[in-house]
């Protein structure tokens, strides 16, 4: 007995496969699974580079424990954003594109998040993307977090 698929059935199967891949690729994921288990957040940003008395650049690093107000503010800010898969996620690539320039690094315990100005993020050595329209969401989130870091 030979099973053959008709032309219409082949088209329907192809459309179904494309739809499933699109749903997986575009489904938003929350940062909550990283922030919920973390007892401390460490943040380094290109916006927090200062100069010492000798004019030498110094990178500021901020650390906040779970009971700190700024920790809560940063987590609340992260909860407003999401990320989704890219083709690089599916190929298990840990390389951001050449046009992506890392702007902020966040450590949640032993988990690391690197955010670039292009919207690409590196999360646990896998490349994902924030938002669906270039790097707008990533830039907006970094601006908000930098504001928290610089506030008194």
Please place each PLM-identified region on the residue numbering.
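Function-determining sites in protein domains
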Residues: 2-152
């Amino acid at each position: 007995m030979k099973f053959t698929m008709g032309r219409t059935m082949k088209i329907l199967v192809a459309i179904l496969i494309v739809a499933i891949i699109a749903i997986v690729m575009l489904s938003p994921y929350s940062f909550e699974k990283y922030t919920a288990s973390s007892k401390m957040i460490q943040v380094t940003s290109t916006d927090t580079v200062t100069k010492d008395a000798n004019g030498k650049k110094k990178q500021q690093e901020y650390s906040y424990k779970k009971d700190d107000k700024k920790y809560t503010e940063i987590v609340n800010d992260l909860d407003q954003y999401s990320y989704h898969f890219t083709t690089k996620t599916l190929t298990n690539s840990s390389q951001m594109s050449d046009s992506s320039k890392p702007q902020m690094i966040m450590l949640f315990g032993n988990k690391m998040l690197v955010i670039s100005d292009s919207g690409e993020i590196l999360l646990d050595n896998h490349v994902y993307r924030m938002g669906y329209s270039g790097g707008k969401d990533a830039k907006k989130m970094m601006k908000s977090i930098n504001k928290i870091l610089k506030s008194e």
